[in-house]
Design a protein with these regions (language model features):
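A conserved acidic beta->alpha catalytic loop
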Residues: 54-63, 113
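Short beta-strand-to-loop acidic/aromatic patch adjacent to the donor-nucleotide binding site
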Residues: 102-114
């Protein structure tokens, strides 16, 4: 796909790649490239390494900022054709380049990360020298950061495929070069997986490749450019959940055989104090408004998808005030499982409408999570997430009966 490549040092082989996908990141990419170069030089000086900027044909000077920053490690710039957006398309260029260069180890880091250090490269690459095929990061996170992972991506991935990968939507990860072929061969390559769905797509494909997977503690929070969490929520929700549901169809022979989940090895945890994550504010009124407005827009569709007992419970929740608002976990699990089955029963255009209808219910789930955890520690909030994951696993026979009865 790459329409443009700049490879001033003529690199034709590499053992290790650090890739930085980007779109209009001229402000930060030089810093990220510098930190990545230091990490490669300091911890993997024995390897033939290269930095690759996989870019969406940015027009803000990203290429110039990347190529001009002084680094000890050689650099390659790859760009998609003009007007071809999406991190997934950047990474598809990367997979092809990994194959061309014969790279054994690949690390990917986001271009806007302010908290990256050279240690990050070590943390994401070193486990692969110990035989792991895919490395997911573990950051110190605020309890309300990435509620999409806490309430959907983590519990569903864990329940379906039997691996406990806490942050499967993370944009930084490592993988063995041999996985590039698996990524290129995956039959699911949709608009969703080309965009926000790419991180969960990679995590899921890697789990199903049956290579050893681990998590690596990054030593602190991930700090990147501040954005309004609602600004891209609809697209993010559609693309992440749509990708999860799409992959359920491809990998059903595997996940239907998985009964319970197993812990995933964690690297890099020490007894040292770590920096606290930035404080996050949540607009509870906005969440409540989005939940209640869903009844006006989607009640008819909900009644087609969900059992009547679920509809009654949603109506009951609608009558709760903000202070008393709650969302029974069993109801939430049944809703997600019913939605996943319905997704595979409708045409492609109707799938988008189904995801639209699920979004306000998700808003209610996030609100309930906030209400339940606002006075507890991050650790206690994590315990709640773990307990809810067990309900997903215990309810899997319900999903199987619905799936097989389609």
């Amino acid at each position: 796909m790459a329409s443009y490549e700049e490879n001033p040092q003529g690199i034709s082989q590499a053992d290790m790649i650090v890739a930085i996908p980007s779109y209009n990141e001229a402000e930060m990419i030089g810093y990220v490239a510098s930190q990545a170069s230091q990490g490669l030089a300091e911890y993997f000086g024995h390897s033939r390494s290269v930095l690759i900027n996989c870019d969406n044909h940015s027009l803000d000077g990203t290429r110039e900022a990347f190529m001009s920053v002084p680094t000890a490690i050689p650099k390659i710039y790859l760009a998609t054709p003009p007007n071809t957006p999406g991190k997934g398309n950047n990474l598809r260029n990367l997979f092809e380049k990994v194959r061309d260069l014969g790279a054994k180890v690949v690390v990917v880091v986001d271009a806007d990360v302010k908290s990256i250090t050279p240690q990050w490269i070590k943390n994401l690459a070193e486990p692969m020298e110990k035989g792991f095929g895919f490395v997911c990061p573990l950051y110190v996170r605020h309890k309300y950061e990435s509620t999409l992972a806490s309430t959907i991506a983590y519990p569903i991935t864990r329940c379906l495929y039997g691996r406990r990968v806490r942050q499967p939507l993370a944009g930084d990860f490592g993988f063995q070069g041999q996985l590039a072929d698996k990524f290129l061969q995956c039959p699911v390559w949709t608009e969703s997986s080309q965009n926000h769905g790419i991180n969960i797509w990679m995590s899921t494909v890697a789990i199903n490749a049956r290579l050893p997977i681990c998590q690596s503690f990054m030593g602190g929070p991930k700090v990147h450019r501040n954005e309004d969490p609602f600004a891209q929520l609809t697209a993010l929700f559609h693309q992440v959940v749509g990708t999860i549901f799409d992959l359920m169809g491809v990998y059903s022979d595997f996940w239907r055989q998985v009964k319970w989940s197993k812990p995933t090895a964690i690297f890099g945890v020490s007894g040292e104090d770590v920096e606290s994550p930035p404080v996050m504010g949540i607009n509870e009124n906005r969440l409540h408004e989005r939940f209640t407005s869903g009844f006006e827009d989607y009640l008819d569709l909900w009644q087609q998808i969900f059992d009547q007992s679920v509809i009654h419970k949603l109506q009951e929740m609608r009558g709760l005030g903000m202070q008393q608002f709650s969302f029974p976990i069993q109801t939430w699990v049944n809703i997600l499982f019913d939605a996943a089955v319905a997704y595979h029963q409708v045409s492609a255009p109707d799938r988008s409408t189904l995801l639209d209808a699920l979004l306000p219910i998700y808003m209610g789930k996030v609100l309930a999570f906030v209400r339940k955890t606002e006075r507890v520690s991050v650790q206690q909030a994590e315990e709640l997430v773990e307990n809810e994951c067990m309900v997903f696993e215990e309810t899997k026979p319900y999903l199987l009966s619905k799936w097989d009865g389609r």
